[in-house]
């Protein structure tokens, strides 16, 4: 029972860290265009992170991404020690990339840690390879979708607004950026909170198989406090902010105007809602980065700082294997006690 409580606590801590680690995804463009101050922006994003709970519960009527994450590992192999190892590895990698100002994926960190510890514990038979491969494909597909949608949407908006006075257009797009930022924050809450829900669900299922009182038989029995806690934790984390990554996302990839901020956030939100519909966990970091690149590419390819982009992509590719290896090492240490 104590181990289960520790895992749930650490998972919610990870969710909180995810909030301030990924806060930049929702607010970087709205801060860089000076529509809101950093403080105002994190409050705005945190509020809509939590609104996502009610959308998932009352409108969507379920938590499909949480179900996908909980099934990353074959149910018969799920155990509390390797879940603990995966969560610890995810926290360590997330804090390291936050400290370095690298916008890596909290989502893939968590899934990589979960899978890596499972492989260390039971071998490759323990993981659902089809789910892992689907998630891996969307490491590249999600930012590509965001980039293509943003590129096309930017050209469309520029054509529609070609006769508008620049000052009038900027005023309207600054107002619209409040809406686009809110839409993206809802997508962030929907996507990222459910990943932690999936891990907690797996822990509760493992607890049930071990005869512990708090356990559940399947994710369909997941109590409401799990979802409420996860959405609350990510909202509180978002309020804490992540200013190093805000700078990278908002200014280092490409300079962003209010019009471009609206387009990038709208394209990013579209991608997140699409993957929510498909029940595939994706990275909000990858998604908004792809959208920002798509916006920058409409000016000219040289407007995108490809050196920064390459370093981001390297971090993305390394996230799952590094967090997986780290989780495997931690599991080896945990089993010594």
Describe the role of every protein-language-model region.
Residues 1-337:
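Multi-pass alpha-helical transmembrane bundle typical of ion/small-solute transporters
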């Amino acid at each position: 029972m104590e181990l289960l409580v520790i895992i749930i606590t650490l998972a919610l801590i990870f969710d909180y860290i995810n909030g301030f680690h990924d806060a930049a995804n929702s607010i970087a463009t709205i801060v860089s265009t000076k529509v809101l101050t950093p403080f105002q922006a994190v409050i705005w994003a945190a509020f809509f992170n939590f609104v996502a709970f009610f959308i998932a519960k009352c409108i969507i009527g379920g938590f499909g991404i949480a179900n996908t994450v909980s099934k990353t590992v074959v149910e018969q192999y799920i155990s509390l020690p390797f879940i603990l190892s995966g969560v610890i590895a995810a926290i360590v990698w997330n804090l390291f990339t936050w400290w370095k100002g690298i916008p890596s994926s909290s989502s893939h960190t968590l899934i990589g840690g979960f899978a890596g510890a499972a492989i260390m514990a039971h071998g490759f038979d323990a993981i659902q390879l089809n789910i892992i491969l689907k998630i891996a494909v969307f490491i590249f597909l999600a930012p590509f979708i965001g980039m293509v949608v943003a590129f096309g949407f930017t050209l469309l908006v520029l054509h529609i607004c070609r006769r508008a006075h620049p000052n009038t257009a900027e005023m309207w797009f600054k107002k619209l950026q409040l809406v686009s930022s809110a839409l993206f924050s809802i997508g962030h809450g929907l996507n990222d909170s459910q990943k932690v829900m999936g891990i907690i669900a797996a822990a509760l299922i493992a607890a049930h198989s071990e005869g512990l009182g708090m356990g559940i038989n399947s994710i369909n029995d997941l109590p409401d406090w799990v979802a409420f806690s996860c959405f609350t934790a990510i909202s509180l984390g978002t309020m804490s902010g992540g200013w190093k990554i805000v700078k990278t996302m908002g200014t280092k990839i490409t300079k962003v105007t209010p019009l471009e901020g609206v387009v990038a956030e709208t394209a990013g939100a579209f991608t997140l809602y699409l993957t929510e519909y498909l029940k595939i966990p994706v990275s909000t970091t990858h998604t908004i980065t792809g959208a920002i690149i798509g916006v920058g590419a409409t000016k000219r390819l040289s407007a995108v700082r490809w050196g920064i982009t390459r370093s981001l992509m390297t971090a993305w590719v390394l996230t799952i294997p590094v967090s997986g290896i780290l989780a495997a090492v931690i599991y080896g240490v945990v089993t010594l006690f």
